[in-house]
Curated annotation (Swiss-Prot):
It comes from the Eukaryota. It is found in: Cytoplasm. GO terms for molecular function: structural constituent of ribosome. It comes from Tetrahymena thermophila. The gene is RPL18A. This is Large ribosomal subunit protein eL20. InterPro entries: Ribosomal_eL20 (IPR028877), Ribosomal_eL20_dom (IPR023573), Ribosomal_eL20_eukaryotes (IPR021138). Keywords: Cytoplasm, Ribonucleoprotein, Ribosomal protein. Belongs to the eukaryotic ribosomal protein eL20 family. The keyword Ribonucleoprotein applies. GO terms for biological process: translation. The lineage of its organism: Eukaryota, Sar, Alveolata, Ciliophora, Intramacronucleata. GO terms for cellular component: cytoplasm; ribonucleoprotein complex; ribosome. It holds the Pfam family Ribosomal_L18A.
């Protein structure tokens, strides 16, 4: 049985369910009595198993530590405090294409960092055919309005931004006028 996270949205959107974990591990001691250094890393993954796998992949690349040379101490999920305001996130990443490794910087608007990362994964899959396993997130940041670079997010920078109502939905003024079955077809134009 799969356990649901507290921040998982209630509606079934098309976004990939991405969670943020802090994985802590220690190198196995070579000699008796020595204290091994503790290594920590923030990882975006679907679940704890994928988080551990991504952690060991990065440790092999960065610190030259294999899974057999260390042990995982803890895997903790990070929950964001406020999901009420839309923020702009800047994400630095690298991904493996069929020919080479590419570095990228992308900006997304979302209420949570997990949502921005899931947008990133879908965007990379659609535009670059990159699988989620080939994407390595290097750095994330919440951007101030003056730090926004990309035109798609620059258009949303205005605080007094308004959207036109393209389609009006006629609703009954009071609850007593609301019915389950109508005698005529509704007009939606």
């Amino acid at each position: 049985m799969v356990r649901k996270a507290a921040q998982e949205p209630k509606d079934d959107t098309l976004q990939m369910k991405v969670r943020q974990y802090v994985v802590s591990a220690a190198r196995l001691p070579i000699e008796q009595g020595t204290k091994p250094e503790i290594l920590q890393m923030r990882v975006f993954a679907r679940d704890e198993v994928h988080a551990k796998t991504k952690f060991w992949y990065n440790m092999r690349k960065l610190n030259k530590i294999k899974r057999s040379q260390g042990r995982i101490l803890s895997v903790n999920e990070i929950y964001e405090k406020s999901l009420n305001t839309v923020k702009t996130y800047g994400i630095v990443l690298k991904y493996q294409s069929r020919t080479a490794i590419h570095n990228m910087y992308k900006e997304y608007r979302d209420v949570s960092l997990n949502g921005a990362v899931s947008q990133l994964i879908q965007d990379m899959a659609g535009n670059h055919r990159a699988q989620p396993d080939t994407i390595q997130i290097i750095r994330t940041a919440t951007l101030e309005p003056k730090d926004i670079k990309r035109p798609a997010t620059l258009a949303m920078r205005n605080a007094a931004l308004k959207f036109p109502i393209v389609k009006t939905i006629h609703r009954p003024s009071e609850k007593k006028y609301r019915t389950v079955y109508k005698a005529t077809r509704p007009t939606t134009f």
